[in-house]
Amino acid sequence: LKGVVEAVARNMNLRVSADSRPEQGSFYRSDHFPFAKAGVPSISLKEGDDYVGHSKEWGEEQFKAYNSAHYHQPSDEMRDTWDFRGMIQEGEIALAIGRMISDMPEKPKFNPGDEFAKPTR
């Protein structure tokens, strides 16, 4: 699905980048990981590190503060101060990706040699 994601990103004047925190293994902890193991391709959309009006360092500080103080804690709740504009953009990207996949003549599949090319159960 990399080509689909890259095409959508180009059409939306965005760029695709590698996972900035691969050591966290978020794909392997995701809800769609069992599908990948069964041979069903999936993607993970995540926030980037280009924040409108803020530096990369600001974004990293926000991530670290939330992750250390609130992630999977009783305080892990929505806040009125959150800015959802980026989430709207992610939804638009996901919709465009879904549309492109639905127009494909064949179902998506993993490329030979990909980690999940051979389904496991």
Give the positions of each predicted feature.
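Secretory-pathway/membrane protein signature
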Residues: 1-121
